[in-house]
Amino acid sequence: MSRFFVVIVSSILFTTFLSGSVLKEKVENIIGTKDYKMHNSLIGLLFKDESKYIINNQIKYLKVFNTLQENGLLNLRLNKPRDIEIEFQSSEKNFKSYKILNDVMHMIGYRYFFTKSMSIDDKQTLIWKILFKAEYMLDPVVLLNELRKNSANVIEVVNKGSNKWFYKIDFKNADLDSAIKIDNYEKVKFQKPLRAYMLKIEEAQSLQVISRNLNNWFPNIVFFDKDLKILKVIKKNRVYKGFKVKIPENTRYVKVTDLYNLINIKRGLSVIVR
């Protein structure tokens, strides 16, 4: 019995030590060895309770970055504009992963970046590398907060040095935060669009779109499943005042726009799902 107790205690102590070691190594990687050594005492105090930052053997990166930022330990400013490379990795190779990442980058103010490479490796992992020039590193707190809004889970973050960062993200249960949820039998009136309307629906059978007076709407409607795989596309080459269509099975998202130009629906559209 006492031997069993010793084994259990030893296991707990080893796990705690391992968690602390992994956490401290990660903090050192994020802020750099020089700053880590300079602020070692403060870091030891801030991350003393590892259970706040590691749950089920998974580092809670948003909490780690928040703690570093709130205590002045996350230096994002560069001495001059630099080329910055961000590598995103996702085991979900569907278009939804890319869509969410692209939307998030735009949402946090990064509209001028270009793709260095995009590929799927032997393990069917999506790897997307982007480049942009800036005086500040990409703020991980802002990025991770936006990803969380889309129910995307950050698995790993690595500072690779030379202004290169790596983010491994789980999109398995992700949902488009930019899509507007519409309940069955709810009528939603949309104002002048800045981009296509993206809708989120559940178990609806039909979609009705009503155009406003003085619009010249040429319907363009796309139905997607939960992974943003296209299920059906509708394009009409004449003006409609209204349009009703049966929703394909397994539809999760619907894009409603104009076939030619958003100016044709500048007075907005109304949508009803049933």
Question: What are the residue ranges of the model-derived segments?
Answer:
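Extended low-complexity, serine/threonine- and proline-enriched intrinsically disordered segments
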Residues: D83-I108, V209-S211, F218-D227
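Gram-negative bacterial Sec-dependent N-terminal signal peptides
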Residues: M1-L23
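Short, ordered beta-strand-loop transition motifs
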Residues: L46-D49, L74-I84, M118-L126, Q191, ...
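Long, charge-dense tracts
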Residues: V104-T125
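C-terminal edge strands of extracellular/lumenal beta-sandwich accessory domains
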Residues: K24-Y53, K60, G72-K93, L144-I182, ...
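Long, acidic and serine/threonine-rich low-complexity regions
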Residues: K48-E50, L62, N102-M105, W128
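C-terminal, beta-strand-rich globular interaction domains
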Residues: S178-R274
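Noncatalytic modules at the cell exterior or secretory-pathway interfaces
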Residues: T125-L131, M137-I155, K164, A204-Q208, ...
